Each structure stands twice: as C-alpha cells, then as structure tokens.
Amino acid sequence: MGVWKLVYHTSNCKTIKCRWTYVLKSDGRYKARLFVKGYTQVQGIDYEETFSPVARYKSIQYLLTHTALQDWEIEAMDVRLSYLHGVLEEEIYMEQLEGFVAKGEENKVCRLMHSLYGLKQAG
C-alpha cells in the first residue's frame, strides 16, 4: 500500500508510537484503524502548522437569518476530514507495530510516506 517503508533507526530519528482501535459498527461489522500517537509531536520540529477550517460567526449568522426569512429548514451533518492520502513533506518515523515486527528487521522503524490517523498532518 506504500503507507510506510522500513528503514534503519538512526540516533537522530525520533519515533512515534502507534496503536490499534477497534469499533463495532451499527451494521455488525468490525472496523480496525491504526492510530499514530500524534500528541507526542512537537510544533516546529515534527510539523510546521495545522489548519482547522472554521466558519466566521457573521457567515453563520447570515445563513441562519436568510434561512429563517425564507422559512427553510436546516439539517445538520458532520464532515470528518482526514487527509490520509496526502504525501508527507516531513520525515516521520513510527515504531513497528507490536505483534507485526518484520522478521530479521527488528532494529528498523517505519518511515511514513502517507498520513495516518492521529498525525498532526492528517488534519
């Protein structure tokens, strides 16, 4: 899948730990996701900036006023944004997954090529 590649661990490469999360969906299926513990990332070292799209208060106020004047109804929805397919610009290293350590490559770490859940770069 090309999400990461195994590389030798050097003394100057900081690694991030990861964990699995498991969810039972409403249709009875199970879903597993690999999360990186991105809360250990330090701004200015591991990433430059983050962005969270937020609407201006005046824009929301205008939208609600216009909706009320037109006697329209509003429905709410949640849009989850995770940029998992974007190529990483920074070099980020993750420890190998517990229980999935590559045989004969125990001293290597995963260099992330794409974002994973939990990374600051994942949105």
What label would you give each PLM region?
Residues 1-123:
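Long, low-complexity, charge-biased intrinsically disordered regions
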